[in-house]
Every structure is written in C-alpha cells, then in structure tokens.
C-alpha cells in the first residue's frame, strides 16, 4: 500500500471554519473560533485519511507572479475581517506547536505549493490528498491525487471527494480542462476576466467539443453560439491571460523535505499549553495526561487522614491570617476538603475513618467562626467603624492612601455559597469568593474554573483542569478509582482560591468594582443562600388541579384546531402544521424553508388576528409548555419538606441580573391568565402570608436619573402616568385625551428605548410600518432630548473604553463594538445603551435584597425572604409581623439608591403568590 501525504490549503480551511462557526473568544477577548474549527477539521481528516506525511500551505500578503501578469488579479476581494486576520498567526503558531510542517513561498500562492507537492509526491509513488474549499484545485486531480472539498448543506458539513474520474462525471471535462473552462468563463472570486458573454454552460460545451481554447480558436468559424464566436475573436488574448492566471504552478521553487513533513505526535506539551491558553477544553481531552502534566504538577500536596493531625492542622489555620478552602461534594455528600494554609502548605482531608462528614464540616465552620470573631475584635480594638451600607461610599478595607488592607483574616473559596450548603456562617467579611470576583472582572464568561483563574490571575500559571485529573468521572466514581486525582483537584481549588485573592482584589480596586464586590455581591451570597435553604412551599393538590385545568383546555383547543383544519394531525409537528396552514388552508404569509414552512411564533403571531386557527395554535403551544414546564415539571422539584429549593445564580448574566435554575422560577408566565394561575400553587406555611413588593418602572426611573432629562424627571416628580405623559408629548394630544392605543404604543417606546430598540424592532412589536416606528422614536427623542445624548454617549464610551458601567461601577465589556461585522456591531451598540440601565436596576434590587434580609435577621423576625423575580421580592411573612415587615420592605427598597426620581414600590399581600401579586 502506497504512503500518503495530506496537503491542507491553510487560508481556505481557516476561512471556512471562521464563517461556519459562531464567533468564539477566550477570556482575554481573543478571537479563537476559526482556529478551533480548523483544528477540528484537521484532526478529523487525519483520522479519516491516516496519512504518513502532512503539510499545510498558506498564502502570503506579498503579490504573486499572477499580479505581475494582471494587476487587478483578486482585486475585487473584500478585505479579510479583522476577527479572522488576527487568527492567521495564531493557527500558524498552533500548527508549529503540534509539529506540523507549514510552507509558504513569496511570489506564489498556497495553491501553487499544494500543486507542486502533489505532483512531487505522485512522482515518488505516493498518494496525495488535498483538503481545500477552492474548486480551482480540481485541475490537480488524478488517480493518485484526490481533492477533498468540504460542503455545507442545511448546517451540516459533508466532504466531496474527487479523483480524475469524479471530475469528469461532475463537470464533463478532465481535470486539466478545468483550466480551459476558467479561461473562457473567468472566475469572479479571483477576478479572472475570461471572455465576455461566455458562462459555465457555454464554456463547457466549447471545451467538451474542442478540448482547449487554442483548438477552439483554430476552429473559430465553427464556434457556436455566434456571441461566443465573436467574443473569442475579439478577446482571445484575454482568454489566454485568464488561462495563465487559472493555471496552478506545479514546479514552484519551494524548500521541502519529507522528513519535516512526516506526521508525528501532534499532542505535544507546547500544543497542550496553547490549547489551554485558547481555552479549547474539548481538544484537551485528546492529550495524554501523563505527558502534559510533567511541568504543570509543580505543587506538592499533603494528605491529612488522622484525627490528631486534623486537629493540629485546623489549629494552625485558625492561628493564621488567611486560608484557602474547597469542599468536595456530590448529591449532598461530602467526600473531603482541600485546605491551603499558604501557597506551599496545602492539604487534602478525606472523609474516612474518624474524620466524618460532620466532623470535617464542623471544623470548617469553626474556622469561619474564629475568623469572624478575630476580625470583630480587631475592629473594636482599632475603633474603626463597621462597614458602611452605602455602596457609593468608601469602605473599611481601604487605607487612606487608596491601597487595600490585607491584614484582615479571611477564608477564601471558589464558591462560598456551595460551601454554605454544608456549614453555617453569616459574616460576608470573613470570606473571599474567587468565583464571584472573577465574574465581576469578566462577566462574559460562561463558567469560572480554578484553572482559568490561575492562568489569568497567577501570571499565566498552568494548572491541570478537572477533566485532566478525573476525566469525566463523577466524584463518587473518582473517590473509588482515582483517589490521588481527587485529592489533587481539592488541593488545586483551595490553592487557587487563596493565591488569587490578592491579585483579584487589586484588579477589583483598579477597575472601580471593589465596592460592587464587597457591598453588593459578597453580602448577596448569604442572602441567596438563605433563600435557597428556605425555599418556597408548593401545594401539591393545587398543582395537580392546575395541571388538570390545562389538560382540559389543551384538549378543547386540539379539537377546535382539528375541526378548523378539516382533519386530525400532529399539532406538535411544525412540518405537518405548515402543510395544513399554508397548503391545505392556503393562508397567506407562509415562509418556506428547506425543511418545510416556518411555523415560528413571529410568523404565526402576524397571522393570528386574521385566522382563528392560528390564534388557537398559539394558545395550544403556550398551554402545552405550561403543562410540561410547570404543571408536570414542578412535581419532580418538590423536596421532602414540601418546598421547592431553587438555585439562585449570581454569576451568569452579563448585566448583573440574578437568574434561577432547578427550577427556573423567574420565567413564571405573567401575560396570560392561565399562566398567572400557576402562582396559586405557591403558598406560605400556616400562620404566614405572602408580602409581595415590586419596584414600579425601575428601569425608566434609572433612565431618568442617569440621563438627567428634566422633562422625564418632572413627570415622575408630579406622579404622572408616565406612559400617558409620553403619549401626550409624542402624539401631540392633551393628556386627558390620550387613547388606550396611544398609551400602549408609548409604553412600548418607553421600555423599548431602555433596551436600545430599533425602528424595525418597534415596528414588529406594534405591527406598524418601519417608517412609523422611526417617527415614534424620533418624536420620543424630541420629547426627551437628553435621553438621546445620553444613549449616544454610552455607545461612544463603550467604543472608547471597551466597556460601559452601571451607576455603582459594575462593568459590562462589549467586544462586539470592535467587530467588523455590522450585525455584531449593531448588537454591541444596543448592549452599550441598555446595560448601564439594566445593570443599575439589577444592582438596586440586589442592594434591596441584602438590606431586607439583614433587617429581618437583625430584628429577629420569623419572616423570611424566599423569592426574587426581576424587580419583585416575595416575603413569607408571619401574620403578627405584617406591619413591621411592610415597613422594612418600604424603607429598604426605597432607600436602596438615591435617584433624582424617587423609587416607588407596589406592595400586596395574599394567601398565595397569585393573590399577593
């Protein structure tokens, strides 16, 4: 069997990967999507082709011999997007790290290098495979040289393989005659002119009959059609030049040796480190852990598995100033802990023998208590004030010269809230949460792992990731099979939490987010922990009854839809529904896709007012989702105590909003009555009621304050109906004569402006023309002139700094503002306009939550904060405490921020969430 060489067209495959994948970036903001896609294509092709040799060819910026022949060669090509351009040196660096032979040649294109190497290898008796997205390379196909062309159809990439015979079958000409076709028809991609009036069909007929442009020219008078004959007569010199431009040079003077091209071990340590830097976690699984960890496992860890040693270890930790802690848990079970006394003394404490879960968690709890106690004593001794409540003020962790104090005792962890599930503490100043700090410093990341933190904040330190230590094993499986890896994992987490504290604190200070961290996010950990532990009670019988109501209505809708359709069909099948609506019933406005008609909500919503069947289908979908998500889905979420304990996430959204999962209680429907009724299943325990407090139009009030628009501020100060006021101003009608429709439209504009809505978006929301929507927005900005300047200023600030900030200093990076892609850039501008407003509103609700939680606790009340949904707080309130809790909610929510317009709170009470809302 012949040896094989795989030849890769570097720029072509990189380009395909760039446009075929989402725009990926790593935590440093470096674009990586094209490199990631290239590597996946490369590795997959190697697995399929199994070559002995590999070479990747790239173009250079310098002009080639073709530019000397024709100055306008490739002159119509658009410049390479900057996001792609910056990845070219990156892929070359990666290939070099993998030991891949990379070849370039000044004056020649990658095609010429590939053609030369293909012919050279064929002459040596080898098989050659060329991978490229460029069909020009088909001219190189022979029985020994195969061209592989990736082709994307309906989002899926397949590969077309061409030897000489496949070229003939597809194009009716031999591979060398591909050049003749280009000579006649030209190539718009490369700006090869060809001859006027001859397209692919005519060119193919001519070459099939005459074989070459020279032979066709010799039989000029016989050429058909007439237009082609006259064009050949007048432009034969252009055809000859086009042929020369299209011909791939197969004897380029390049330096090449098969020794350098020999395919060796691609998974080198250098490649591993680069993959880590670029955050290609899926690719890291391909590397041999033992080989790549030689230089990364520098840290020495100790195991403490006896009671006496454990006592001594915790005594030492309590005597010290700072400790890093990690707890290894799964499904509520504790397997062990990592404890870093400093950056050299790091211990793993397994739960075994006399060291029980209760003992270990008790020692960690004691450590936190000791830290709190010590800090309190130091504060009293130094006669300093307690931490100030106002997030806009300086705090006691800062010296007068602006530097941070590090003399305070502290326990550091990657996720303090996860720690609090197993130990009790209520002192935010006793802990440092590296995960929350990392989120504040870069809120665009989807996860915050210890190895990422080490790389970013510990001078590029490379630590093995969890996957490298444990693979895909569960903690329990690792406990049984990979005890050493589990110990290392626990120690690395504890070490990273401790080591990252100082650089992260400095970064928070330098970015102006120290107060956001200490005054908002750090206390919030304890607030959310309390909410998760309390949970919210669910009435199972009511939930069952709700599900039955939904089932009845869904059944009624099903029959109505079938009756209107004239037949039974699967309403949950978009394909079947599309045929019924747009073919059988002949509804206008159908949008055909490759798989059938689109039945997306935005399509159907436009048709609903005119067609009752569509209105019924939309209701059917909404109710079916309600049933599966809530009526059925919530049943499995009810714990043994009869309550649902949702998880509240503070490190997910880029704007700073809190989200909830397992289950998501923030998406409880509010627009339709049957959706709102789900709130009836959430009830307080006996002797309690729900108090629900909701900020009124908080984002519009924030907009008024931040923009300083006098007219909007005055409207709020006069307690006017803000939407009616806007309608009156925008539509030039007296306040008392504003119609309901005008008020609804003004409301859409008011809230749309907050979210940076475009005229197109507003036209879709209001079912009006884009021109009308643009006029509404223009009139709005004429009414409130400072808002336009404020929003434009935010976009400019985002472009200049790369981020925008909330009123309290929270940053929101916006890399999209620098994108060469118009859609991405437009998205970035909308983000720049709405993030400071949304983010400030999110900060305010968090401050309010912290204040309410602390007041309830400090005043020893039985009532507790159990839920937060956007701008709404729900308190499970002891009936005897209703007046006191109402006053606390009113005072703390209104006092959470000082705005030029007063914050307003709507408050209701009820025996279930539905009644309270």
Segments predicted by a language model, with ranges:
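Conserved catalytic core of nucleic-acid polymerases
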Residues: 476-479, 533, 641, 645-646, ...
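Active-site palm subdomain of RNA-directed nucleic acid polymerases
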Residues: 508-520, 524, 844, 848-869, ...
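Conserved "right-hand" nucleotidyltransferase catalytic core of DNA-directed polymerases
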Residues: 235-354, 388, 394, 399-410, ...
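Extended two-metal-dependent nuclease catalytic cores across DNA- and RNA-processing enzymes
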Residues: 2, 22-26, 75-254
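C-terminal polymerase-core module
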Residues: 552-559, 563-615, 782-830, 834, ...
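Domain-level signal for Mg2+-assisted phosphodiester chemistry and nucleotide/NA-binding surfaces
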Residues: 1-101, 816-819
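Function-dense linear segments that define catalytic or interfacial modules
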Residues: 339-343, 441-472, 489-496, 650-735
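Active-site-proximal helix-loop-helix substrate-binding element of RNase H-like nuclease domains
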Residues: 154-182, 301, 335-376, 381-510, ...
């Amino acid at each position: 069997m012949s040896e094989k060489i795989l030849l890769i067209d570097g720029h072509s495959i990189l380009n395909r990967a760039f446009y075929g994948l989402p725009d990926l970036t790593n935590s440093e903001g470096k674009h990586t999507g094209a490199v990631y896609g290239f590597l996946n294509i490369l590795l997959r092709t190697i697995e399929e082709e199994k070559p002995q040799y590999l070479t990747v060819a790239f173009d250079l910026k310098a002009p080639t011999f073709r530019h000397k022949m024709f100055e306008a060669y490739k002159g119509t090509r658009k410049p390479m997007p900057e996001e792609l351009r910056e990845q070219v040196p990156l892929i070359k660096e990666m290939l070099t790290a993998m030991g891949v032979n990379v070849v370039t040649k000044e004056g020649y294109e990658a095609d010429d290098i590939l053609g030369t190497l293909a012919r050279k290898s064929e002459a040596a008796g080898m098989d050659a495979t060329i991978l490229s997205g460029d069909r020009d390379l088909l001219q190189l196909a022979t029985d020994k040289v195969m061209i592989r062309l990736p082709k994307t159809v309906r989002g899926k990439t397949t590969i077309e393989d061409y030897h000489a015979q496949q070229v003939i079958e597809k194009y009716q000409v031999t591979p060398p005659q591909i050049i003749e076709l280009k000579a006649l028809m030209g190539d718009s991609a490369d700006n090869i002119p060809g001859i006027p009036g001859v397209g692919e069909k005519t060119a193919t007929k001519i070459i099939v009959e005459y074989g070459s442009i020279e032979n066709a020219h010799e039989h000029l008078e016989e050429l058909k059609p007439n237009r082609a004959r006259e064009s050949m007569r007048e432009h034969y010199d252009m055809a000859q030049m086009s042929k020369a431009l299209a011909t791939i040079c197969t004897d380029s003077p390049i330096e090449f040796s098969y020794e350098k091209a020999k395919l060796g071990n691609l998974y080198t340590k250098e490649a591993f480190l680069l993959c880590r830097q670029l955050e290609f976690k899926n690719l890291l699984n391909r590397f041999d852990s033992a080989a790549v960890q030689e230089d990364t496992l520098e840290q020495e860890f100790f195991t403490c598995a006896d009671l006496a040693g454990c006592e001594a270890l915790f005594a030492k930790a309590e005597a010290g100033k700072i400790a890093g802690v990690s707890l290894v848990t799964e499904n509520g079970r504790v397997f062990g802990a990592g404890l870093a006394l400093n950056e050299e003394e790091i211990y793993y404490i397994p739960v075994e023998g006399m060291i029980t879960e209760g003992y270990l968690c008790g020692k960690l709890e004691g450590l936190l208590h000791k830290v709190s106690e010590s800090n309190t004593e130091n504060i009293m001794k130094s006669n300093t004030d307690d931490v100030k409540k106002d997030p806009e003020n300086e705090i006691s962790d800062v010296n007068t010269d602006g530097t941070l104090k590090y003399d305070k005792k502290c326990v550091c962890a990657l996720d303090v809230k996860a720690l609090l599930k197993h130990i009790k503490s209520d002192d935010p100043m006793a802990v440092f949460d590296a995960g929350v700090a990392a989120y504040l410093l870069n809120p665009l990341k989807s996860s915050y792992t210890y190895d990422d933190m080490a790389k970013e904040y510990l001078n590029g330190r490379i630590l093995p990731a969890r996957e490298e230590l444990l693979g895909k094993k569960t903690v329990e499986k690792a406990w049984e099979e990979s005890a050493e890896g589990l110990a290392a994992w626990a120690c690395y987490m504890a070490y990273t939490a401790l080591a990252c504290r100082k650089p992260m604190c400095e970064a928070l200070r330098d970015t102006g987010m120290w107060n956001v961290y200490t005054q908002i996010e750090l206390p919030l950990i304890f607030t959310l922990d309390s909410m998760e532990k309390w949970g919210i009670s669910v009435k199972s019988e009511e939930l069952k009854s709700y599900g039955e109501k939904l089932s009845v209505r869904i059944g009624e809708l099903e029959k109505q839809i079938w009756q209107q359709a004239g037949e039974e069909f699967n309403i949950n099948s978009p394909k079947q529904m599309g045929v019924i609506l747009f073919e059988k019933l002949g509804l206008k406005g159908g949008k055909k896709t490759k798989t059938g008609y689109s039945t997306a909500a935005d399509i159907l919503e436009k048709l609903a007012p005119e067609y009752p069947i569509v209105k019924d289908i939309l209701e059917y979908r909404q109710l079916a989702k309600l049933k599966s998500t809530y009526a059925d889905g919530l049943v499995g979420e009810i714990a043994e105590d009869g309550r649902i304990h949702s998880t509240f996430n503070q490190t997910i959204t880029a704007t700073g909003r809190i989200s909830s999962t397992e289950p998501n209680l923030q998406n409880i429907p509010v627009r339709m009555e049957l959706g709102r009724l789900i709130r009836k299943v959430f009830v307080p325990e006996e002797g309690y009621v729900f108090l629900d407090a909701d900020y009124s139009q908080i984002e519009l009030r924030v907009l008024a304050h931040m923009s300083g628009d006098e007219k909007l501020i005055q409207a709020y100060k006069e307690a006017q109906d803000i939407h009616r006021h806007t309608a009156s101003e925008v539509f030039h009608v007296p306040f008392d004569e504003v119609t309901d429709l005008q008020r609804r439209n003004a409301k859409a504009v008011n809230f749309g402006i907050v979210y940076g809505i475009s005229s197109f978006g507003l036209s879709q929301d209001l079912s009006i023309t884009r021109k009308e929507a643009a006029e509404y927005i223009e009139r709005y900005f004429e009414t409130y002139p400072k808002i336009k300047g404020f929003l434009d200023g935010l976009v400019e600030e985002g472009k200049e700094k790369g981020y925008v900030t909330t009123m309290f200093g929270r940053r929101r990076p916006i890399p999209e503002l620098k994108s060469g892609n118009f859609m991405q850039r437009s998205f970035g501008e909308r983000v720049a306009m709405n993030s400071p407003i949304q983010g400030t509103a999110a900060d305010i609700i968090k401050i309010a939550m912290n204040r309410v939680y602390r007041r309830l606790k400090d005043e020893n009340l039985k009532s507790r904060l159990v839920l937060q949904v956007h701008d709404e707080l729900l308190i499970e309130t002891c009936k005897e405490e209703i007046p006191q809790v109402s006053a606390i909610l009113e005072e703390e929510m209104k006092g959470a921020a000082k705005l030029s317009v007063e914050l307003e709170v709507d408050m209701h009470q009820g025996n279930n969430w539905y009644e309270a809302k």
